[in-house]
Swiss-Prot record:
Signal peptide: none annotated. It comes from Francisella tularensis subsp. holarctica (strain LVS). GO terms for biological process: translation. The keyword Ribosomal protein applies. GO terms for cellular component: cytosolic small ribosomal subunit. Belongs to the bacterial ribosomal protein bS18 family. Part of the 30S ribosomal subunit. Forms a tight heterodimer with protein bS6. This is Small ribosomal subunit protein bS18.
């Protein structure tokens, strides 16, 4: 059996996910630029919603790409 995934944000005691922290957000985006689901990352529902909002804000401000074509 596999080990249960734990939410990193809960362990670290993060109150709110910052959209300007691009390096942390990149860990939750796959190669094609999609947001990785919580069942894969183990993120709790509360932080998954915050994460999605932060990623969308960062995309809007051009801190993160919308799709994989921008990685080249």
């Amino acid at each position: 059996m596999s080990r249960r995934k734990v939410c990193r944000f809960t362990i670290e005691g993060v109150k709110e996910i910052d959209y300007k922290d691009v390096n942390k957000l990149k860990a939750y985006i796959n190669e094609t630029g999609k947001i990785v689901p919580s069942r894969v990352t183990g993120t709790s529902a509360k932080y998954q919603r915050q994460l999605a909002t932060a990623i969308k804000r960062a995309r809007f401000l051009a801190l993160l790409p919308y799709c994989d074509r921008h990685f080249n």
